[in-house]
């Protein structure tokens, strides 16, 4: 068994790309080795901003030998009557690179055929590895690549060196132009001791440690966590958990060192979200908090090196932050000179989407739709929701949001004039209306905020679908998937909103009257509803719910997602019922029979005529259905779907008996029609909850 180590030394790889590149390099190497038939025990991948590394442990010395049996023509076609080889036999032998007399004969169920076993000896690892390295190098999934120097090769950043060692011996490979191929590796750009020759992974690790490089990202993250907490504690503060920022700093540094900085206390008069946004998102600093969660005039920054006098570095970091905070203080003062409500006309000059008008028009639509939603769930908040919708986008034309786009909505909440107590409700709704911004993002806590958020997202979805703007593959420039998932989460959160989505989508469509959407109302609304169910299916699948359960509910054409999910949850429990498989099979059979009926004289909406019931099995089924029908409908109308399915489960025996003993398609029209109406009644009861015929029974 051998050890293979491969490092690509580069200029600084962007932090957002590094974790994925480390993972991809390991996976691509593993796949390439498997495809090449070169066995191994383990593939390990590591990386820092200036290097990507793969180590293959327990690598086999050579590929496995391959035997391939080639089958030629049938024996009777391979030789003529005199026993001489035909052109077919000669051609087959020539293709195998041998004479005809070297071919074998193989017996098959179809007769005797000529054959040849081609034996191919496996290549040594040193022969195979260069091709694997080239394959992996080209396949790394970078969002963007570049050329460097005068070469034509492309990579995310210029490649400086390549070190490839198989049991201490360099592997000759050509990956790109103007690259050093060497067994010497470099440590930290500033603290390293120059290039060091390595023989294996153990000596490589030692060279990295001596050269002030923490090779493993998890080690860098642990160092960052400990350093941040220690520095914050030194001034009596704490730091909020932020694994994303920890990981980003780990991808920015090779030797992370936590340093404590401070800023002038006068900046604490600025809203805390402005300060934390500037520190976290713009400078990658960790804000320091007091015990109550308020900001202290301190921050922790992660440097990429140690110096004899760290205060020099700290002053530099403080100077950069001060410039940011000076800008923020200026915008905070200037923006408040104009009332937020007075900025509404300015939105007329801001295009929201080329085909869908300005932000002013969107605000008008949002106000109307928010009022319509509130009228259904909280009439007392209709006026507040309308006001929040109308002014929700006004902060987009402020200086602060222009400088810090992440603060959209938040600054609107601060800038809204407080003329009465209810304005606090409006301000909070404006702050929350972009929520949730992603799959794991927090949801609005206020009812008014949820209403305005729904109005915003529904307006976006209906407008885009109405103009034929829909997600395709991986492209979703207007975030429609995110918007749909946001609507789903808003409706399904703990205190869900029972809303008729179809009616709301129709209302949203009509608000585009002056613009004129390209698609018709029915087509647009149906497209949006289908899109919701597609995202709902993905959302529930992520929670472990089988796709067929959603299909069974979607078939009912419901537009209340809270109700739809309640039905799905009942089906999840129903799957555990002993009668589940039999009842699913029965529903499929009933649906199949009824779908094939072509009889213009048959009206399935008529009730069952007890006088026409002849067989005891159909009489028993009709009686059992009559006994549970009212209870099933009552349970269903009150959202007690599990109880409704429990009542229906009791029908298993009589349904089985019916199909065992009764011929549905009787020659007598009256009898046949009555039996079909009985099946339609049974199927209709199940469809009070879901289309059970859509469910799937796992094969045993």
Curated annotation (Swiss-Prot):
It catalyses: tRNA(Gly) + glycine + ATP = glycyl-tRNA(Gly) + AMP + diphosphate. It is found in: Cytoplasm. Keywords: Aminoacyl-tRNA synthetase, ATP-binding, Cytoplasm, Ligase, Nucleotide-binding, Protein biosynthesis. One of its GO terms (cellular component) is cytosol. Disulfide bonds: none annotated. GO terms for molecular function: arginine-tRNA ligase activity; ATP binding; glycine-tRNA ligase activity. Pfam families: DALR_1, tRNA_synt_2f. The keyword Aminoacyl-tRNA synthetase applies. It is an enzyme of class 6 (ligase). One of its GO terms (biological process) is arginyl-tRNA aminoacylation. Its EC number is 6.1.1.14. It comes from the Bacteria. SUPFAM superfamilies: HD-domain/PDEase-like. Tetramer of two alpha and two beta subunits. HAMAP family: Gly_tRNA_synth_beta. Belongs to the class-II aminoacyl-tRNA synthetase family. This is Glycine--tRNA ligase beta subunit. It comes from Magnetococcus marinus (strain ATCC BAA-1437 / JCM 17883 / MC-1). The gene is glyS.
């Amino acid at each position: 068994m051998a050890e293979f180590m491969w490092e690509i030394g580069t200029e600084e790889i962007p932090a957002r790309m590094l974790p994925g590149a480390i993972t991809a390099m390991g996976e691509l190497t593993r796949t390439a080795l498997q495809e090449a038939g070169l066995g191994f025990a383990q593939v390990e991948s590591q990386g820092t901003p200036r290097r990507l590394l793969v180590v293959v442990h327990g690598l086999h010395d050579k590929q496995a030998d391959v035997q391939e049996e080639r089958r030629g023509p049938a024996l009777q076609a391979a030789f003529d009557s005199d026993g001489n080889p035909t052109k077919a036999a000669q051609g087959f032998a020539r293709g195998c690179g041998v004479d005809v007399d070297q071919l074998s004969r193989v017996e098959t169920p179809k007769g005797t055929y000529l054959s040849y076993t081609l034996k191919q000896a496996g290549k040594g690892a040193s022969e195979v590895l260069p091709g694997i390295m080239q394959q992996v190098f080209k396949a790394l999934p970078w969002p963007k690549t570049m050329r460097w120097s005068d070469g034509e090769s492309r990579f995310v950043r210029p490649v400086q060196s390549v070190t490839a060692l198989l049991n201490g011996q360099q592997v000759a490979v050509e990956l790109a132009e103007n690259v050093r191929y060497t067994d010497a590796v470099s440590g930290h750009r500033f603290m390293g001791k120059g290039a060091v020759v390595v023989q294996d992974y153990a000596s490589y690790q030692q060279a990295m440690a001596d050269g002030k490089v923490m090779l493993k990202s998890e080690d860098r993250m642990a160092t960052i966590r400990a350093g941040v907490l220690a520095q914050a504690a030194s001034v009596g503060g704490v730091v909020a958990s932020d694994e994303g920022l920890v990981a980003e700093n780990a991808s920015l540094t090779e030797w992370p060192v936590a340093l404590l900085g401070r800023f002038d206390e006068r900046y604490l008069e600025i809203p805390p979200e402005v300060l934390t946004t500037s520190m976290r998102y713009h400078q990658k600093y960790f804000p320091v908090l007091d015990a109550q969660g308020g900001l202290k005039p301190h921050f922790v920054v992660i440097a990429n090196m140690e110096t004899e006098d760290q205060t020099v570095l700290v002053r530099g970091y403080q100077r950069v932050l001060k410039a940011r905070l000076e800008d923020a203080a200026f915008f905070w003062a200037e923006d408040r000179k104009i009332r937020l409500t007075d900025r509404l006309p300015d939105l007329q000059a801001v295009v929201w989407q080329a085909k869908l008008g300005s932000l002013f028009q969107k605000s008008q639509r949002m106000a109307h739709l928010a009022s319509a939603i509130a009228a259904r769930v909280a009439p007392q908040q209709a006026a507040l929701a309308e006001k929040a919708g109308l002014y929700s986008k006004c902060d987009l034309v402020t200086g602060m949001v222009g400088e810090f786009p992440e603060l959209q909505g938040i600054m609107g909440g601060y800038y809204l004039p407080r003329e009465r107590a209810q304005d606090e409700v409006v301000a909070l709704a404006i702050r929350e209306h972009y929520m949730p911004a992603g799959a794991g993002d927090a949801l609005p806590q206020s009812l008014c905020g949820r209403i305005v958020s729904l109005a915003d997202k529904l307006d976006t979805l209906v407008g885009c679908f109405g103009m034929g703007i829909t997600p395709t593959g991986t492209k979703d420039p207007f975030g429609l998937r995110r918007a749909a998932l946001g609507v789903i989460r808003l409706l399904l959160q703990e205190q869900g909103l029972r809303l008729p989505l179809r009616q709301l989508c129709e209302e949203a469509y009509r608000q585009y009257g002056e613009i004129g959407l390209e698609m018709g109302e029915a087509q647009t609304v149906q497209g949006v509803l289908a899109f919701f169910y597609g995202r709902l299916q993905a959302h529930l699948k992520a929670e472990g719910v089988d796709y067929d359960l959603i299909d069974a509910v979607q078939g009912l054409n419901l537009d209340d997602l809270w109700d739809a999910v309640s039905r799905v949850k009942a089906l999840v429990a129903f799957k555990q019922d002993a009668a589940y498989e039999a009842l699913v099979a029965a529903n499929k059979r009933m649906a199949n029979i009824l779908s094939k009926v072509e009889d213009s004289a048959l009206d399935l909406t008529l009730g069952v005529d007890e006088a026409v019931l002849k067989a005891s099995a159909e009489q028993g089924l009709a009686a059992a259905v009559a006994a549970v029908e009212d209870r099933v409908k009552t349970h269903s109308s009150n959202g007690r779907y599990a109880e409704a399915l429990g009542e229906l489960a009791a029908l298993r025996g009589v349904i089985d008996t019916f199909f065992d003993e009764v011929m549905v398609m009787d020659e007598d029209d009256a009898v046949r029609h009555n039996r079909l109406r009985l099946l339609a009644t049974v199927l209709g009861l199940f469809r009070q909850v879901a289309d059970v015929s859509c469910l799937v029974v796992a094969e045993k």
